[in-house]
Amino acid sequence: MAGGSKIGDYVPVTALIPRRPTLVSLQEAAAHCRGCDLYVKATQTVFGEGPASARVMMVGEQPGDREDLAGKPFVGPAGRVLDEALEQAGIDRDDVYVTNVVKHFRWEGAARGKRRIHKRPRTWEIQACRAWLDAELALVQPEVLVCLGASAAQSLLGRGFSVTRQRGELVPSSLAPKVLATVHPSSILRAPDSETRHSEMRKFVADLKKVAHVLASEPKAA
């Protein structure tokens, strides 16, 4: 079904969302998602994870190879970078809900071997998946929304948003009281050498420290 040729198989996400959703019921419904063609090659839906009381929601692009196999977001190499950065920034992992704008892994096979190569999701696939993210936002109601990478930032803040120019800025939004965009942790792993990797990690942690400052300066809601 490459290229979305079997449109009749698609089911709008809005038709799957429960009338009175919880994070658990949303995850159960998302397991049957057929909103675009990505479900065909993906192992499973990878829904968001974290407490409904999370003060921070972090949104990436899509699950990777490890996440697709495990069924959990941010458990691969990029997830380990994120966990380390959160710890260095002083953010409690229990205060964080992590998810992606797209819930299925988009990939293509390598020229040789069985390796699955990440491919950036197409605009219509991101749009098809948006209702899941909107439902997550409505339930969690984070104090700070963190967009990890350009796909997440442009999906949530508009196509004109530039992470390069506006990285690390805390901006108000209808989505959350504060929104901050930064790089995706996978970009740190792609750094050409150790020195660059350490430099990019420091910048990433500095961005997350701004989030930590917001949490520290504003009392946690009861």
Predicted features along the sequence, with ranges:
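A polyanion-binding, active-site-adjacent surface
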Residues: A2-A222
